[in-house]
Amino acid sequence: MTHQTHAYHMVNPSPWPLTGALSALLMTSGLIMWFHFNSMYLLMLGLTTNTLTMYQWWRDIVRESTFQGHHTPIVQKGLRYGMILFIVSEVFFFAGFFWAFYHSSLAPTPELGGCWPPTGITPLNPMEVPLLNTSVLLASGVSITWAHHSLMEGNRKHMLQALFITISLGIYFTLLQASEYYETPFTISDGIYGSTFFMATGFHGLHVIIGSTFLIVCFVRQLKFHFTSNHHFGFEAAAWYWHFVDVVWLFLYVSIYWWGS
């Protein structure tokens, strides 16, 4: 590094992309084993490998950005483009679920009884837990914006308070969603309605868990004084992701819970 004459970060060889790919293989194979053979061993191994990979990869990136100073403005610009493209790819990912839902609901087949929701399906009341979930996520969007502005103003105390509130609301949302799943009168195997409902809301719930994990990492990093008022892309990326999760939920609520019921 002593002879480097450019601002780009030449990343050292790392095993984490390989272990990350291995964990993805183990988790997907583990899900198949769980669904078809009621065995969770492979899934647990995949989740453990994934957790260890995340911890160690994050640790390396934190070292590179803070202590080693590799995240120059031009490197941060590349990271910004990367995060934007990642969120765009997620938009298309969810677009597929919405397409499946509207394709099935706007022209219900005779097998569904020619109506939507299909005959025999009792949909959830959109004015109960789903509405509470909506208000919880909207409130978390406000609190993370408060955290971002506090960080830019150098107000450490308010930033930590706001970030803690956001994480708490994210965990509360996940618990509400879990309780809702427990009480639903239909399952993922109840035709196209059950499939689209649980796939769309379930993947959104997974994204809330991922976003909450991002924010918890940011909270720990803020406690360790890793962020400054003008150098905090790790938090900014997590905030962008959280706002994306917010917006997706609004579309889910209006489409699947309210209109679809």
UniProtKB/Swiss-Prot annotation:
Membrane topology classification: Multi-pass membrane protein
Job description of the protein: Component of the cytochrome c oxidase, the last enzyme in the mitochondrial electron transport chain which drives oxidative phosphorylation. The respiratory chain contains 3 multisubunit complexes succinate dehydrogenase (complex II, CII), ubiquinol-cytochrome c oxidoreductase (cytochrome b-c1 complex, complex III, CIII) and cytochrome c oxidase (complex IV, CIV), that cooperate to transfer electrons derived from NADH and succinate to molecular oxygen, creating an electrochemical gradient over the inner membrane that drives transmembrane transport and the ATP synthase.
Name the UniProt record assigns to this protein: Cytochrome c oxidase subunit 3
Protein family according to the UniProt entry: Belongs to the cytochrome c oxidase subunit 3 family.
A GO MF label: cytochrome-c oxidase activity
Residue intervals annotated with topology Mitochondrial matrix: 1-15, 67-72, 153-155, 224-232
Pfam families: COX3
EC number: 7.1.1.9
Gene: MT-CO3
Catalytic activity: 4 Fe(II)-[cytochrome c] + O2 + 8 H(+)(in) = 4 Fe(III)-[cytochrome c] + 2 H2O + 4 H(+)(out)
Record keywords: Membrane, Mitochondrion, Mitochondrion inner membrane, Translocase, Transmembrane, Transmembrane helix
The organism's place on the tree of life at top rank: Eukaryota
GO CC terms, sorted: mitochondrial inner membrane; respiratory chain complex IV
Mitochondrial intermembrane side, ranges: 35-40, 106-128, 184-190, 257-261
GO BP term, example: mitochondrial electron transport, cytochrome c to oxygen
Organism: Phoca vitulina (Harbor seal)
